[in-house]
Amino acid sequence: MRKIERTNQFKRDFKKHGDIEAALIEVLYKLINDEPLPEKYQDHPLTGEWSDHRDCHIKPDFVLIYRLVGNNVLQLVRIGSHSELGL
């Protein structure tokens, strides 16, 4: 099981979107247990400056950006809409 690490930016993003917590539970459970996410989350690697990150869609226009660090850490980097995150 991976340990969850939240960046300061993720913490700020989450404060703005605290109502999304329930939708995150299934995603986080699967990620910390290294289980594949269902297709509905559209999990995929990012490119460019985000090339070592992945994103998944919590809702149609609501994205979680994260990194799997080694075998032990799930780093939550950003959360928000595509426009908020510049994607």
What is each PLM-predicted segment?
Residues 1, 14-15, 34-37:
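Short hydrophobic/aromatic-rich motifs at helix boundaries and adjacent loops
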Residues 22-36:
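Compact soluble domain cores
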Residues 1-4, 12, 19-22, 56, ...:
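Enriched for short, Lys/Arg-rich terminal
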Residues 32-57:
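A short, surface-exposed loop/turn module that caps and links secondary-structure elements
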Residues 28, 32, 50, 78-80:
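Generic secondary-structure microfeatures
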